[in-house]
């Protein structure tokens, strides 16, 4: 064999080895190839690590705390009768524009609640007896005399009429409502004509097909008309939202407001992606179709490529609103422990009260709560900010009446009311006064305490927090699929 032949064979062998090596490297590139920093940085979760801005907590801590301790407890609690029936007005007219965009899809409709399905204790709660002025009515005075009706006592001469006239009662009622509404961060409509009980288990929050101009108008109104706004208007289609870099140039109150709305928006989008209509074919588990996670839709809503780099920051804002509502539950814990959670079903009522106490203890032991005192702490300017917050959130709850999909409207109203209740708790002077005076430690509390939440507010608070908890849990599932 000549030298030339040997060299030719060696070159051929080397070429074969090189080709095989290249093929092998390509197929195993997931393990051995150099990591492309550009590629790894462009995923939905690239910002979900480290400290949560404006909070003394990090993402991993919240993930573990929620997924291991809070989410399982909420799953068993929110199916109970006290929390599954929510009273809401879905017939309220839109106060901002003609209601011209009704969703005709069957998934937009709310399934009516059977009257007999609602526990009697909820229906017969006697809402008027919760009002501050009730104790002055004639009804409240009947049978309330401590005096003897003996023969030596002329009741007609000694009777002290402690009741008030119907006209005065109505005026007291208006004063009481006004005083209570002063601390509200949302519009409460459960007492209005047209309000009804809705079974939340029959109407889960999931994809309905409601989209297009009507849906965009809702969020555009919330962001543009209610947000404090940024200085830089970007040219892309996400100019309705404040770019995260612009948030560095605004004060904490403005930044927190935007992050709360953005976090709520992200949470709702995660619900739609995790409970997506995959097929309208009837399934034995759900006659309305086959539902499940849609990874493609999740990436479309949150990946940097489709959101001009903002999607991962929107996901990060979910943790911010979660910590706000978590802190509200911790602050209201002494009050919430005094609630009866009454439905008239004694065994279940006892179970709910035990479950509430257990979850509140877990929440109170969380080490990195949001510091609500960081907001509105700048003297006179803070008074105006606090007033603006209330007006803006009340306006957002009005906008929810403009949603053209009844099921979307239901969950939008519930979550904005839950958020409003959380803010009411965090910034209520009455709650601060009651707590500082040791009111919740007393064995007996007067029928009309200085601070009070209605049943509807409590139901909204826990269910809204349940939605945020569910979003963080579902996000971990998407993260596992996209790794």
From Swiss-Prot:
Summary of the function given for this chain in its UniProt record: Oxidoreductase involved in disulfide bond formation in the endoplasmic reticulum. Efficiently reoxidizes pdi-1, the enzyme catalyzing protein disulfide formation, in order to allow pdi-1 to sustain additional rounds of disulfide formation. Following pdi reoxidation, passes its electrons to molecular oxygen via FAD, leading to the production of reactive oxygen species (ROS) in the cell.
Cofactor section: FAD
Enzyme nomenclature, EC number: 1.8.4.-
PANTHER family in UniProt: ERO1-LIKE PROTEIN, ERO1-RELATED
GO terms of biological process kind: chaperone cofactor-dependent protein refolding; protein folding in endoplasmic reticulum
Chain positions carrying an annotated carbohydrate: 232, 395
Topology relative to the membrane: Peripheral membrane protein
Assembly and interaction partners: May function both as a monomer and a homodimer.
Predominant subcellular localization, coarse grouping: endoplasmic reticulum
Residues given in the record as FAD binding sites: 206, 208, 219, 262, 265, 301
A single MF term (Gene Ontology): FAD binding
Disulfide bonds, paired cysteine numbers: 44-57, 46-55, 94-402, 103-108, 227-251, 405-408
Signal peptide residue numbers: 1-29
InterPro entries, per the entry: Ero1, ERO1-like_sf
One annotated Gene Ontology cellular component of this protein: endoplasmic reticulum membrane
Protein's name in the database: Ero1-like protein
Protein's cellular compartments: Endoplasmic reticulum membrane
Pfam families: ERO1
Keywords, sorted A to Z: Disulfide bond, Electron transport, Endoplasmic reticulum, FAD, Flavoprotein, Glycoprotein, Membrane, Oxidoreductase, Redox-active center, Signal, Transport
Family: Belongs to the EROs family.
């Amino acid at each position: 064999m000549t030298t030339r032949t040997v060299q030719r064979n060696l070159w051929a062998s080397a070429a074969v080895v090189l080709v095989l090596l290249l093929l092998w490297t390509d197929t195993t590139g997931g393990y051995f190839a150099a990591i492309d920093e550009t590629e790894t940085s462009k995923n939905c979760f690239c910002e979900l690590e480290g400290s949560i801005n404006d909070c003394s907590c990090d993402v991993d801590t919240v993930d573990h705390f929620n997924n291991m301790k809070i989410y399982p407890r909420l799953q068993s609690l929110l199916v109970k009768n006290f929390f599954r029936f929510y009273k809401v007005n879905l017939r309220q007219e839109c106060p901002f524009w003609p209601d011209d965009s009704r969703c005709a899809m069957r998934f937009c409709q709310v399934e009516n609640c059977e009257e007999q399905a609602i526990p009697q204790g909820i229906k017969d709660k006697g809402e008027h007896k919760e009002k501050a002025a009730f104790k002055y009515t004639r009804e409240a005075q009947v049978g309330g005399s401590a005096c003897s009706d003996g023969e030596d006592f002329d009741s007609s001469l000694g009777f002290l009429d402690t009741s008030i006239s119907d006209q005065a009662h109505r005026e007291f009622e208006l004063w009481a409502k006004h005083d209570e509404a002063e601390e509200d961060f949302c519009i409460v409509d459960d007492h209005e004509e047209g309000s009804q009980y809705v079974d939340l288990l029959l109407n889960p929050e999931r994809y309905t097909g409601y989209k297009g101009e009507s849906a965009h108008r809702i969020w555009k109104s919330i962001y543009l008309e209610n947000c404090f706004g940024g200085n830089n208007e970007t040219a892309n289609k996400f100019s309705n939202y404040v770019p995260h870099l612009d948030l560095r140039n605004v004060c904490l109150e403005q930044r927190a407001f935007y992050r709360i709305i953005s976090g709520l928006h992200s949470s709702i989008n995660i619900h739609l992606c995790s409970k997506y209509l995959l097929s309208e074919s009837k399934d034995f588990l759900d006659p309305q179709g086959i539902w499940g996670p849609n990874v493609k839709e999740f990436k479309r809503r949150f990946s940097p490529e489709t959101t001009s780099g903002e999607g991962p920051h929107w996901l990060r804002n979910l943790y911010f609103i979660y910590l706000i509502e978590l802190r509200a539950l911790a602050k209201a814990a002494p009050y919430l422990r005094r609630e009866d959670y009454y439905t008239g079903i004694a065994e279940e009522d006892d179970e709910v009260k035990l479950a509430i106490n257990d979850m509140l203890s877990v929440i109170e032991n969380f080490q990195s709560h949001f510091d609500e005192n960081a907001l509105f702490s700048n003297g006179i300017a803070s008074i105006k900010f606090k007033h603006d917050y209330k007006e803006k959130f009340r306006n957002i709850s009005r906008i929810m009446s403009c949603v053209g999909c009844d099921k979307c409207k239901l969950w939008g109203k519930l979550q904005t009311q839950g958020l409003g209740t959380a803010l009411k708790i965090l910034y209520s002077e009455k709650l601060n006064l009651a707590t500082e005076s040791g009111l919740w430690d007393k064995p007996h509390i007067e029928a009309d305490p200085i601070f009070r939440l209605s049943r509807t507010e409590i139901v909204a608070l826990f269910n809204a927090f349940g939605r945020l908890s569910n979003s963080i849990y579902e996000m971990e599932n998407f993260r596992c699929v996209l790794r």
